[in-house]
Design a protein with these regions (language model features):
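Conserved micro-motifs of the catalytic ATP-binding
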Residues: 5-10, 47-50
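A conserved beta-strand-to-alpha-helix junction within the catalytic ATP-binding
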Residues: 11-26
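Conserved catalytic submotifs in the C-terminal HATPase_c
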Residues: 11-14, 36-46, 83
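Short helix-loop "hinge" at the ATP-lid/N-box region of the Bergerat-fold HATPase_c
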Residues: 66-67
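Short beta-strand/loop element within the Bergerat-fold HATPase_c
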Residues: 73-87
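Short conserved segment of the HATPase_c
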Residues: 100-112
Length: 170
């Protein structure tokens, strides 16, 4: 299959990223009651300009991976922070799962890359997931990267440009 990101059509609309992440987390919390979701998501809206469906797909994929790699009862923490100038938002999704070996950490965003084939089979493939996520985030002028400690879990970080819309405009 040919997938050239340049041919993709991106919608442009203002999306409340906090509301989106609340909804995604709440949906997974319903379908995976055995997982422990912790949300640090501000109540006031933070707006990102972009494609709602594609960004939802990205965060769905990241949270779904966190669920797959986290033992039951461990925490999955979704955190949203704005930088000092309120022009970038940083989202982190942290699991307390098996972690990713350091030698693999930068390769997980490559197409069809798999950390461990034997483990992957039981987990279901995430080959295209993070590569596609990277394409989508970069098309939104953002960045995505990972940190991990084997045996302690992983954190996926996403930063995106955002707009702080004053309350009086809402």
């Amino acid at each position: 299959g040919k997938m050239d990101i340049k041919e993709e059509h991106y919608e442009k609309e203002f999306i409340d990223i906090n509301k989106m992440l609340e909804q995604i987390t709440d949906r997974f919390a319903l379908t995976h009651p055995e997982k422990n979701f912790i949300k640090h998501i501000p109540k006031s809206p933070i707006f990102v300009e972009g494609d709602q469906d594609k960004l939802t797909q990205v965060f769905d994929n990241i949270v779904n991976n966190a669920i797959k790699y986290s033992p039951n009862g461990k925490n999955i923490t979704i955190r949203v922070r704005q930088n000092y100038h309120h022009n970038r938002v940083s989202i982190s999704i942290k699991d307390e799962g098996v972690g990713i070996p350091l030698v693999h950490i930068d390769k997980i965003f490559n197409r069809f890359y798999r950390v461990d084939k034997s483990r992957q089979r039981s987990m279901g493939g995430t080959g295209l997931g993070l590569a596609l996520a990277k394409n989508i985030i970069e098309a939104h002028k953002g960045r995505i990267w990972a940190q991990s400690r084997e045996g302690y879990g992983s954190i996926i970080f996403v930063t995106l440009p955002c707009e702080q819309i004053d309350d009086e405009w809402l």
